[in-house]
């Protein structure tokens, strides 16, 4: 779970099957997630890595990397992060990305554009453009990208299922 904050989504994936192990990666110190790991009974199957996913190693030999609402932190360096994910995945591995899906002319989706409007007024380039992730993923070597656009609890977002 890359940039997974409290790690709850990653823990849900790990805990879903007894044969799964996983890594939670974020800037938060391990103490932030250790109680959740313990309460879910996953201490022997979960590793916590702290750091900056843009600057630090993210690990290796993963079958799945979750990158949920973190690609905006890679604006201007998206290929660099996607290459790092590509290199960290096993052959046939999957990178699951959820991002904002802002239209190139910034006219939609309305819920995402309105949420970022104060930042745009301040000249901040926030949000990931539609197809920005999938296009960059192909450029760094991923072989297949499946896209879905869904209304999630955080707004209308793209779900990219990207295969190595």
Q: Where would I find each of the regions flagged by the language model?
A:
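Short, glycine-/aromatic-enriched active-site segment of Class I SAM-dependent methyltransferases
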Residues: 107-123
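A short glycine-rich, Lys/Arg-flanked "PGG" loop and its adjoining helix->strand segment in the class I
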Residues: 79-91
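A short acidic, Gly/Pro-enriched loop at the edge of an enzyme's catalytic core
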Residues: 54-65
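Short alpha-helix
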Residues: 124-141
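Core SAM-dependent methyltransferase catalytic element
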Residues: 141-164
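Class I SAM-dependent methyltransferase SAM/SAH-binding core
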Residues: 7-53
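A short SAM/SAH-binding and catalytic strip from SAM-dependent methyltransferases
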Residues: 63-77
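Conserved beta-strand signature within the Rossmann-like core of class I S-adenosyl-L-methionine
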Residues: 92-100
């Amino acid at each position: 779970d890359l940039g997974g904050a409290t790690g709850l989504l990653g823990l849900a994936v790990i805990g879903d099957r007894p044969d799964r192990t996983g890594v939670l990666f974020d800037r938060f110190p391990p103490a932030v997630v250790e109680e959740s790991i313990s309460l879910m009974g996953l201490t022997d199957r979960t590793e916590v890595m702290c750091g900056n996913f843009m600057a630090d190693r993210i690990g290796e030999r993963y079958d799945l990397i979750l990158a949920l609402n973190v690609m905006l932190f890679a604006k201007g360096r998206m290929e660099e992060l996607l290459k790092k994910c590509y290199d960290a995945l096993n052959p046939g591995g999957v990178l699951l990305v959820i991002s904002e899906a802002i239209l190139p002319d910034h006219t939609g989706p309305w819920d995402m554009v309105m949420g970022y409007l104060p930042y745009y007024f301040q000249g901040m380039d926030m949000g990931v453009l539609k197809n920005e992730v999938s296009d960059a993923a192909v450029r760094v070597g991923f072989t297949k990208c499946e896209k879905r656009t869904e209304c999630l609890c955080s707004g209308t977002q793209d779900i990219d299922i990207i295969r190595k």
